[in-house]
Structure formats: structure tokens, C-alpha cells
Regions:
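Active-site loops and adjacent core secondary-structure elements that bind or stabilize anionic groups
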Residues: 515-521, 525-802
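Iron-sulfur cluster-binding cysteine motifs and their immediate structural context
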Residues: 211-214, 219-220, 225-228, 248-306
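Glycine-rich ThDP/TPP pyrophosphate-binding loop and its adjacent helix/strand module
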Residues: 133-229, 522
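Thiamine diphosphate
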Residues: 1-150, 192-195, 305, 313-316, 320-430, ...
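Active-site cofactor/cluster-binding pocket
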Residues: 146-149, 162, 296, 301-345, ...
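Short beta-alpha connecting loops at secondary-structure transitions
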Residues: 69-73, 133-148, 175-185, 228-245, ...
Length: 802
């Protein structure tokens, strides 16, 4: 080979080897696995009852095979759904199975699989998931005409043993009940799905369950499309919010809804939950979580962001430095022919990542440059990782690759921290070459749906990015928070990042070309242009933007608690502040005497830990007891829930989020008034109007009765257990302090933190307590140097109310 060519090859191989070696070193990682969208019908429809399993198929519902709790196995080609059971059934003791089948696949060839199962005489229930769109590939309409009545007629003609329909809107079937094919067909609400599936699995032969609920993504698209002055799909004037003060962070709302719009919120009192209003598709299944913290706002609308205030008022308060922005000195692409300029856009599917790549591509095209845009998406559009490779050259004939090679990304626009710090993205980066603009706000992954204690190693991921690009080449922007505060919707974080990168001079395109590309895209043009402008402003003068924002309107950002073991410059001061906040909290909860009892215990622990462990222990046992005892002493009974809901701060927070004519509804399961679900044995929540605020204010004033002989709520086993736990924990503290030493300090902290795991209400809290009892007993056995013993589980709590 010629020497110059050999040198280029060796140089390229050296870059590849260096990146592979860097990625081979141990480093923190996180995976953004594709999952169902917020409000997706499959969040509910793919569940099977205890003791059953299902077979997967082609469609979004295939992702149920990723989720162990759904017990969905394998998949087939289109038209083969459920057919493997024909061969398996004669050779197993299993008597029945479910099979998932999408409506598009049904129309294509899936009905032939059902015909084969009917002919074979196997016991199987096909769940035909009718969501009115080919959702996996972009929401196209199913080829041909298809409706639930037509499916019913065809399945009846094929000889199905039983046909039922499940839907989130049973009332819409009143109009078709008179059709001959619908005669005798049962229509059930989706809340009855578990009970109904238990009935269906006992039906001999091939039965059909049609689950009718419109695709969540398609609902969102249709609502945005205005037809005759109205949304193309009904958009209820209703929003779900969570009173974080009431929330226990148990995660039952995520269990019930499997919705990624239910996000973690770290607070001084632990991890809670909040609803991401920007991504919520108004499915409302989260309301089934057995928790009194859920409130719906009926009527009104979300307040617009700060930037949408009146132009005159806005101009008057906008800092002078943000009025006229200078154009940056941009990177120029010359006709050198050596290499293209590679921009890698990373993020979460369904949030507009591909759109950013398209805007860059169109802007380059408008300037007459050579450009290639390659989107790596697939199933990733459903909440997974998405990459858009944008290659820009001076002329089209200088493009030689559509994909950015290893170490060849000049700019990374990271719309999501997790995806940006993945190995696939890090491999494209190289120190002294790559610049990165990264969204520092973290969206939870699908792991959070199954693990309420899920924590992302955010700082470690940021370190990975800095190592891959160089100490000064990566900039982090709280884009989601800023977009929600400035624009009223977090969806505008991506064009905001694009504007930020452009103002920094890292995008080799004219501003006018990018703005024209946004106009040609034709979607929320004014808002996207505004977001692009705000990104430029943030890049130019971040402090001025912070001054412009009203702190009361700024979306709440709370840092995660300091990791245990990490040094603290002022541990004693931190403990003082923690105790002070908890004393104030318990005083408001009950009275000063109650708070004094708490303070005496914590100060006693502090003295003993100081004497035996010293400052080297960072007062971590004191911190654990301060948080654990506070949690047990402020158990959320009827008085406390009433106090927290009627607190003026909660109502003020709603006023800050909503405008117009709105009212509140509370979703509760109060004693006596709630019926018991015969299928689950759990009280069913009911709606109560705004008048409940007055009742709650009155009930909150009766907290003096808490624990007294005349306490009408204190006689239930649940309340007696909560009060007894306080005494048990104080006994535990005594045991820990009696033998505390450096050798068992970590075990003492582990035991002292057990109350943090006792979360939730009613049966949810009971299940957590059962697990904690086992850990408690095992930990005490280790504390006393004995083999662990399995403690008899406590008597189940029967009187359960939320």
C-alpha cells in the first residue's frame, strides 16, 4: 500500500482501538429499554391472571416479553400467533393459554391462526388487541375496513366457543348493541379484565377476548389535529396530579398503570411520585393505585410557560442582554473533502429526536450542502434509545457514509442523559474532536415501573461523557426543567438544545436555514421557534435567563440524597438541619410534645454515635434514626391525609399549575363508604368533589383525638399496628445503642433504615411490612451473632382503607 494510505489506515485503526479500550474499562451504565407509551392500551391488556401465561406476537405488544411480571413468552411470524400451542397442548398438563394478537395482524393473517386453533380444538383465549392503528410503525390505519362488530361476526362464523368485548368506553357500544352479530355478546369495562380472564380460561375450546382501546400515541396525534374547530379526538378537560405530601412513594400507581408518566420526585421526606403533564395521555389508570394522594383537576387548563405571557409585559422584564443576541462564530465546512461534519442526536423515542435530525437535514439542504440523515429507531420509538446520524458536507459528492463512524462525531446533541452515555453513543465521541450539549434532567427508564427504589447513576454517567470528550467539551443544560418553565411543556426541550448548540457555534448552518426548516416542518411552528430562541438565550447568558424566571414558577428540582459513605464538609450542620425540619414536621403533625419525644430519641443516638464512632461515621446512624423514627411517628392516618390535602400550600401549588375555571376531585377509599372488589378483596376508590376540602379542614382539626380511646379511626388493626411499630422501633434503637461499635456500625445503619421500606396504604403497606418483618428478624439475629431465623408473618390487616 502507498505510505500515505497506510498511515491513514493505521491512524483510523488506532482511533478505533483507543475507543474500544476505553469502553472496555469498568464504567457506570444504564439501559433505556423500549416500553409501552404513557396510556398505552397494552399497559392493561397484556396482563394475565395469576397462574396463567400468554404467547407473544407481532406488534407493540411484543414488548410484553420484556416484562417478567406479564408472563408472556416467545413470539411468531405474523399469522402464527398462538399456533405453537397446537403442538404443545397434547404433551403438557397445562390446560389453557392466552395469545396476544394485534388488530393489524388479525386483518393481515392472524385470523388464520385462530381458525387453526379452532380446528385443532385446543383450549386457548385469543386477546385481539383492537387499538385502531398500526402503532408500531407510526400509527397508520389498518389496511381495509375493520371494526369490533365485524371481528365478532367473523369469529362467530369461525366457531369460537365464546366472544367477549373489553373496553375503556363501554357506553359507546350502546349504539351497536342492536346489530345482529352483537346479540348476546358481553361488554365489560377494562377494570374487570382480571376477573373476566379467570372466567375465560375455564371455557373449553378457542375463545375470543377483544380488547378495544385506542392507541395512546394515535390519541395524542388526533387531539393535536383540529377538525372543524375541534380536536380530532375527545380531549377531556381533566388532569391527574399527585399531592406529594400525601404520597408514600410505594409505587402502587406504577404497578396499576405501568405508565412512564408517573415519575420519581426526590423530596426532603423521601422519594415520592409526580405526573409528567407533558407526556401524560390521560389514560387515568394510575388513579387505581391504592393511595389517597391522587387528585384530579376538572376543567381549566395548564398554565402556559413564562415566555407566553403578554408580549408587552414580557419585553418589560426581559433582561437587556437577551433582547438582541449576537450571531456566534460558527464552525465552517470547507470543500476540503477530508471528512464530513458529524452531528449525533440522541434521546428517547417518541420525544422528537428524529425531528431534530430532520430539521438539521432540511436546513443543510436549503443551504445547498450535502447532507445525509440516518435514524436508528425501530421499536425504540416506544420509549427506547433513538439515534439520528446527521452527516453534513460542503457538497453532496463529498458524502461517503451515512453513519457516523467510531470517534468521528463532531457534535452530540444529547436529548437524554441515559442514551447519550450509552456505549453506542460514547463510541462515536473522541477527546479534542467531539463537543457535547447534554440534557442534564433525567427521565426514568422502564426499570422504575418495576423497582420503586430505582436510582440512576446520573453523576457517573456525566463523568463518562466528560471522559469521552474532554474536561471542557461537554456542557449540561437542565433542558426539560427550563422548557417546562419557559414554554409550559417539556416537549420543547429538544429544539431548545438545538438553539443552545447553534448559539455556541457548534452547528455549521445558518440560523435562517434552521428557522425555515422549523417552519417547513409545520408542527407547532411558533412554539418551536420560541424554544429555539430560548436555547440561544440560555447559551448566551444563562444567569440572565435564571433572573427572568419566577422562582415560584420554575419546575421543582431536588437533588438526590447524598450517597451513603460520601464525605460531607459539614455533617454536624446537616444533621442539625435535618432534625430541625423533622421537629417542625412532627409539631404540625401532632403537637410539640410529640416532636419532643422524637427529638430526645434522636439526640440520644447522636450522643452515643459521637462517643463510640466519632466524626468518621459522618453521623449516618443518627441520620438513619432521624428519618426512620420521623416516618413511623408521622404515619398517614385519616387526620394527616386531611391535613395535607387541605393545606393551603397544596391548593396554591394547583393554582400555580392551572388557570381557568377548575375544580378538584379527590379519589379515596374511606372506611365504611367503600365497597370491596369481589375479585381483589380491596376497597374500591370513590370520587369526592371539592366540598371535601371543607370536610378535610374540619377533620384535620380533630387530630387531638389521634390514638385516644375516642379516636373513631384508631381501633382498626392497621392503625394499631402503626402505633405499635413506633414502640418496636424504639426498642430496636435501645438494642443498637447498647452494643454499638465501629465493627457493627454499618449493620446498625441498615437496621435503622428499615422503616423507609414500610410504604403505602392498606394492603400495599401490609405487604411491605411483611417483607420488612423478615429483614428485621434476620438483622437482629446477625446483630446478636446468631443464625438468621424466619419470623412468623404478622396477621394480615383486614380493615384496610386509603
Amino acid at each position: 500500500l502507498p505510505s500515505d494510505l497506510r498511515e491513514r489506515i493505521e491512524s483510523r485503526l488506532a482511533i478505533i482501538d483507543a475507543r474500544e479500550q476505553a469502553l472496555a474499562l469498568p464504567h457506570a451504565t444504564a439501559v433505556r429499554t423500549p416500553t409501552f407509551c404513557s396510556g398505552c392500551p397494552h399497559n392493561t391488556s397484556t396482563h394475565v391472571p395469576e397462574g396463567s401465561r400468554a404467547l407473544g406476537g407481532i406488534g407493540c405488544h411484543y414488548m410484553a416479553t420484556f416484562m417478567p411480571e406479564r408472563r408472556t413468552e416467545t413470539f411468531t411470524q405474523m399469522g402464527g400467533e398462538g399456533v405453537p400451542w397446537i403442538g404443545q397442548a397434547p404433551f403438557t398438563d397445562e390446560t389453557h393459554i392466552f395469545a396476544n394478537l394485534g388488530d393489524g395482524t388479525y386483518f393481515h393473517s392472524g385470523h388464520l391462526a385462530i381458525r387453526a386453533s379452532i380446528a385443532a380444538g385446543v383450549n386457548i383465549t385469543y386477546k385481539i388487541l383492537f387499538n385502531d392503528a398500526v402503532a408500531m410503525t407510526g400509527g397508520q390505519a389498518v389496511d381495509g375496513t375493520l371494526s369490533v362488530p365485524k371481528i365478532v361476526a367473523q369469529m362467530a362464523a369461525e366457531g369460537a366457543s365464546k366472544i367477549v368485548v373489553v373496553t375503556d368506553e363501554p357506553e359507546k357500544y350502546e349504539a351497536v348493541r342492536s346489530l345482529p352479530q352483537m346479540a348476546g355478546i358481553e361488554i365489560h369495562h377494562r377494570d374487570q379484565l382480571d376477573w373476566l380472564q379467570k372466567q375465560m380460561r375455564d371455557v373449553p375450546g378457542c375463545s375470543i377476548l377483544i380488547y378495544d382501546q385506542t392507541c395512546a400515541s394515535e390519541k395524542r396525534r388526533r387531539r393535536k389535529k383540529i377538525v372543524d374547530g375541534k380536536p380530532g379526538f375527545p380531549d377531556p378537560a381533566r388532569r391527574v396530579i399527585i399531592n406529594e405530601a400525601v404520597c408514600e412513594g410505594c409505587g402502587d400507581c406504577s404497578v396499576q398503570s405501568s405508565c412512564v408518566s408517573v415519575e420519581p420526585l426526590q423530596t426532603d421526606l423521601g422519594r415520592k411520585r409526580r405526573i409528567n403533564q407533558s407526556s401524560c395521555n390521560k389514560d387515568f389508570s394510575c388513579l387505581k393505585g391504592f393511595c389517597p394522594s391522587f387528585v384530579t383537576v376538572e376543567g381549566g387548563q395548564l398554565r402556559k410557560g413564562v415566555s407566553h405571557s403578554a408580549d408587552v409585559e414580557k419585553a418589560a422584564v426581559l433582561p437587556p442582554s437577551l433582547h438582541e443576541l449576537p450571531d456566534p462564530q460558527r464552525i465552517a465546512i470547507t470543500a476540503s473533502g477530508n471528512r464530513t461534519y458529524g452531528i449525533l442526536v440522541t434521546g428517547v423515542g417518541g420525544t422528537g429526536v428524529v425531528t431534530i435530525g430532520q430539521l438539521l437535514g432540511m436546513a443543510a439542504h436549503l443551504e445547498g450542502k450535502g447532507v445525509s440523515v440516518l435514524d436508528m429507531a425501530g421499536l425504540a420509538q416506544k420509549g427506547g434509545a433513538v439515534f439520528s446520524h446527521v452527516q453534513i458536507a460542503h457538497r453532496p459528492d463529498e458524502l461517503f457514509s451515512t453513519r457516523i463512524a467510531t470517534g468521528e462525531a463532531d457534535l452530540v446533541i444529547g436529548c437524554d442523559l441515559v442514551v447519550s452515555a450509552s456505549n453506542d453513543a460514547l463510541a462515536k465521541m473522541r477527546p479534542a474532536v467531539t463537543r457535547a450539549i447534554i440534557n442534564a434532567d433525567v427521565a426514568p427508564t422502564s426499570d422504575f415501573l418495576r423497582d420503586p427504589d430505582w436510582t440512576l447513576p446520573a453523576e457517573a454517567l456525566k463523568r463518562n461523557l466528560i471522559d469521552a470528550t474532554g474536561e471542557t467539551a461537554t456542557e449540561f443544560v437542565d433542558a426539560t426543567t427550563l422548557a417546562a418553565s419557559l414554554m409550559g411543556d417539556a416537549i420543547y426541550s429538544n429544539p431548545m438544545l438545538l438553539g443552545y448548540a447553534w448559539q455556541k457555534g457548534f452547528v455549521p448552518l445558518e440560523r435562517q436555514a434552521l428557522e425555515r426548516a422549523i417552519e417547513l416542518n409545520g408542527v407547532s411552528v411558533a412554539s418551536n421557534l420560541e424554544a429555539f430562541l430560548w436555547g440561544r438565550r440560555i447559551a448566551h447568558d444563562r444567569e440572565a435567563v435564571a433572573e427572568f424566571l419566577d422562582p415560584k414558577r420554575l419546575a421543582k428540582v431536588v437533588e438526590l440524597r447524598r450517597p451513603y459513605g460520601q464525605s460531607d464538609s459539614d455533617p454536624a450542620g446537616r444533621i442539625d438541619r435535618l432534625i430541625g425540619r423533622r421537629v417542625a414536621h412532627l409539631t404540625a403533625y401532632q403537637n410539640a410534645a410529640w416532636a419532643s419525644r422524637y427529638s430526645e430519641w434522636v439526640q440520644r443516638v447522636r450522643r452515643v454515635e459521637g462517643d463510640r464512632i466519632g466524626d468518621s461515621g459522618q453521623w449516618r446512624l443518627t441520620e438513619a434514626v432521624a428519618e426512620g423514627l420521623s416516618k413511623l411517628m408521622s404515619y398517614k392516618d385519616e387526620y394527616e391525609v386531611a391535613r395535607l390535602h387541605s393545606d393551603s400550600a397544596f391548593v396554591a401549588s394547583i393554582r400555580a399549575q392551572f388557570e381557568g375555571d377548575w375544580s378538584l376531585k379527590f379519589h379515596l377509599a374511606p372506611p365504611v363508604l367503600s365497597r370491596i372488589d369481589p375479585n381483589t378483596g380491596v376497597p374500591v376508590k370513590r370520587e369526592f368533589g371539592s366540598w371535601m376540602l371543607s370536610a378535610m379542614r374540619l377533620l384535620a382539626k380533630m387530630k387531638f383525638a389521634r390514638g385516644k380511646w375516642f379516636d373513631p379511626f384508631g381501633r382498626t388493626l392497621e392503625r394499631r399496628t402503626e402505633r405499635a411499630l413506633i414502640g418496636e422501633y424504639e426498642v430496636l434503637i435501645d438494642e443498637l445503642l447498647a452494643r454499638l461499635a465501629p465493627a457493627n456500625h454499618e449493620l446498625a445503619i441498615e437496621l435503622a433504615r428499615l422503616p423507609e421500606q414500610i410504604r403505602g396504604f392498606g394492603h400495599v403497606k401490609e405487604s411491605q411490612l411483611v417483607k420488612v418483618r423478615v429483614q428485621w428478624e434476620d438483622g437482629l439475629a446477625r446483630w446478636h451473632g446468631k443464625p438468621s431465623r424466619k419470623r412468623r408473618e404478622p396477621i394480615p390487616i383486614r380493615s384496610i382503607q386509603a
